[in-house]
Amino acid sequence: MKKIGFIIINYNDYKTTKKLVDNIKDYKVINEIVVVDNKSTDKSVLELKKINNITLIANEENYGFAKAINIGCKYLIDKYKDCYIFVSNSDIRIEEENDLKELVKTFKVKDIALVGPVIKEPDGVVRGWKLTSVNEDILMNIPLINRIYRNKLLNYKDSYYKTLLSYVDMVKGCFFLIDSKALEKINYLDENTFLYYEENILAKKLKVKKYKTVINNKVTIYHDHAKTISKNVNNINRYKITKESFMYYEKNYNDANSLQIFILKILNNINLIVKKIRKK
């Protein structure tokens, strides 16, 4: 049986991280809990050092989400070689150990590299998404009409999730389970984004290598959506960070040409102006 690691990314939120550790610390399915602190500016490292039976990796700077995940994954792979790795935000709640066991069982199906659960958030349920073309992304960024296209282009129909496993292009990055061998073969997550669009890039990299991504509809995990991010980044700055990652993704993974990039930049600026006006 492969060893199983559980990575939690922490930034200025040790209380929430500790709550998740307390949630899972007695789960025998997990061989090691790794907390990666992304150079928190509060007393996170001091407080996290007090927690028994975890491995704490305190980064020397805030590397962003993707690199922090890679640091945790590389630690586990160096130690266990071949393993399954849970990657989790700190603001996650797991109902019971059997939920994690069920997700691990999913790997019995051939060519699956990544497994996601159903994610229950305060404002609804999230499962998987479709990867979209550049032109579809342009449509989804046009003010006023974007909502018309967003649901149709991104989401699978509810009926798609009636079976135990649903194959999807990508899952929500707040919580997923990945096979270390697949992660090594795609050369880990791309560290050129600081925050956001990790899911899209990971999905593209897995797809190129012919790996499968699934939602296990039997398992529901609870997410206090964006609690940590909201606490540390205001809405305008969050939008700017999102769009920086978005443009990097479009250029490097979604085959956007120079005209499409130009159009997307204009739309980004228009949407930023709209956000600032609404904030006043």
State the predicted function of each range.
Residues 59-79:
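Glycine-rich, basic loop-to-helix element that forms the pyrophosphate-binding segment
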Residues 93-130:
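Conserved donor NDP-sugar-binding/catalytic core segment of glycosyltransferases
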Residues 204, 208-280:
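Active-site-adjacent helix/loop segment of glycosyltransferases
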Residues 81-93:
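Short beta-strand-to-loop acidic/aromatic patch adjacent to the donor-nucleotide binding site
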Residues 37-46, 61:
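A conserved acidic beta->alpha catalytic loop
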Residues 134-168:
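Short, flexible, basic/aromatic active-site loop/helix in glycosyltransferases
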Residues 161, 169-220:
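A short, conserved alpha-helix in the catalytic core of glycosyltransferases
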Residues 13-26:
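Short, well-formed alpha-helical segments that are part of the catalytic scaffolds
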